[in-house]
Each structure stands twice: as structure tokens, then as C-alpha cells.
């Protein structure tokens, strides 16, 4: 078991006290190896050692010593330092820059370890067979949805995108089961996105969701859920990091689709030529 990954996967299920313990561990995993149960409860600011016991039992472990052994193994396997350091007002430009870059790289690698390859394969098949691909997302997710709309259009897929609810409603009114809805929402709880996914399912249309919450309301109306794995800090929200990870997931689907379809490369070359004529 990769206990650090396990903590991240179960984070949303933790109580407030357990989240404090998780945050303390993730911020300094090496330091926890040298700590006792009482040390950890004190560092985390929880009332009793019983909270720590409940925490490691929720991970499926029998003792704090077993937890520390698995934690040490997780650290030894890590390709780079496992930290989600928060930005401080005392940090200089170099330190803040390094923290942001490391957090983003860490989030990408964590999501890679978390992703189900079968879900990626199924998503590629849905993209390949879709008559039309409808991308939806609002606020920060709209930028990701538009980027995907642009990419997949260039390899010849019939794509639609809008961040206007009225236009999306009109598009879905004429959609069919042979179309595909791709819903992008970090929380998975944006009311309009959930409603559009629900509408798509009522029409027997497949839905692929990219979200940071596998157990969200949106996920319930999805055929495939591709979940990101990011962590929020005091200044930088996890939604900021998840946007980058969402783009990487869509880049992966795009590359797999293009690599398996000779027509995609041909269409990409055509679109490159067309765009080049618009430049000096």
C-alpha cells in the first residue's frame, strides 16, 4: 500500500480532526516517521491520541507502527520530494516559484497514479465513436473545455463548446445517443453542469466527466469519471492546480486518439495548413 496515496484518496471522507492529521502528515511525512502518536496529535492540533488511532484504522491499518513503516516505504518510492508546501508571505520569489512548480508536478504524478487506465481506454473509444462531442464547463473549467474543443476539432472531430447555458440547452435539445457530452467541473457540484449531464443521460447519451471528486453529484450521471488528485493550500486553491491536471488528462486522450487514427494526423496537417495561411 502507498499510504500517502491512500490518505489523498480518502481525504474527502475524513472528519475535520482527521483532515488536520492528514494535512500534518502530508506537509512533513519524513518528520512523522520520528514522531509518536502523542507528537502527531499535538502537531495536528487534535484533542486526543484517539483521533490518530481512528485515522490509521480508517486507512485499514492496525497500529501506528504499521502506519509509520508504510509511510517510510511511500517516501522511499517517491520520484521527488512529496510535499504540498503552503506559500508564506515571508517567502521570496524563488521560493514561491519553486513551491508552485513542485505542487503542480506532484499533482500531475499523483493523478497519474490515481487514474484508472481502463477508464482512459473507454474514454478514447467514446471520443472515437461519437458523432459529436459536446464540451461544457464554467468559470475556470470553461478554459479547459474550450482548449479541448479546439484540440479535438483540429483532428477532425465534430466538436461543440459554449459556456452559455441557453446555448448548451439548445445544443442538447437536438442531441442524440450517438453524441458524447464531456463535462468538466472541479467540484462536480456545479448545478448547471449536473443538470446538463442528467439531461444527457435521460437522452441515453454517454457522459464523460473530469472532476476532482469521484463521489460528486456529477459523477452519478457519468459513464466514465476521470478524477484529478490535487490539494488545496491557504493561498492556492486545489482548483488552480486541477486546471493544469485536467489539461494533461485531455492531452492524453487527444494523443491516444490521434495515434490510433491515421485520419486524425491527416486532418491535423490540413488544419495546420489552414491556420498557417492566417499568419504572415
UniProtKB/Swiss-Prot annotation:
HTH rpiR-type domain sequence ranges: 1-78
PANTHER family, alphabetized: GLUCOKINASE, HTH-TYPE TRANSCRIPTIONAL REGULATOR HEXR-RELATED
Domain of life: Bacteria
Coiled coil: none
InterPro entries listed in its UniProt record: Homeodomain-like_sf, HTH_RpiR, RpiR-like, RpiR-like_SIS, SIS_dom, SIS_dom_sf, WH-like_DNA-bd_sf
Listed name of the protein: Uncharacterized HTH-type transcriptional regulator TM_0326
Species this chain originates from: Thermotoga maritima (strain ATCC 43589 / DSM 3109 / JCM 10099 / NBRC 100826 / MSB8)
GO molecular function: carbohydrate derivative binding; DNA binding; DNA-binding transcription factor activity
Signal peptide boundaries: none
Domain SIS: 123-263
DNA-binding region range list: 37-57
GO biological process, one term: regulation of DNA-templated transcription
